[in-house]
Amino acid sequence: MLTCIIKYHIDPTKKAAFEQYARNWGQAIPRCGADLIGYYAPHEGSSTLAYGIYNIPDLAAYEAYRARLAADPLGRENYEFAQSEKFLLREDRTFLKLVSTPHGAQK
């Protein structure tokens, strides 16, 4: 299992547009095959950093998921929304693998 973390630099004056973008992905991403953990908008501290986080089985599954997302009507609409509103200043993706187990008390 891989976790994809998307780090966004957003225009702080367009936070509401980013939040709409995140809500749209909240529908499209699970429908297209990824396990969405969530989208996170700035609250305190930096007003320009936001994140999207989801799990995917492997890179081959990621490629298939991206193709489905590009063909999804809401996915296409959301890509176009981001382009037209220009609230995303930068977007970086990294794939991480969980290498620890929970550290709390086990029941």
Q: What role is predicted for each listed range?
A:
Residues 20-37, 55-94:
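An amphipathic, aromatic/His-enriched active-site/gating alpha helix that lines ligand/cofactor pockets
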Residues 2-7, 18, 28-29, 50-53:
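Short, structured motif recognition centered on aromatic/hydrophobic residues
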Residues 40-41, 97:
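Residue-level recognition of beta-strand->loop/alpha-helix junctions
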Residues 45-48:
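Short acidic/glycine-enriched loop/turn segments that link adjacent beta-strands
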Residues 7-12, 54-58:
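Short beta-strand-to-loop capping motifs
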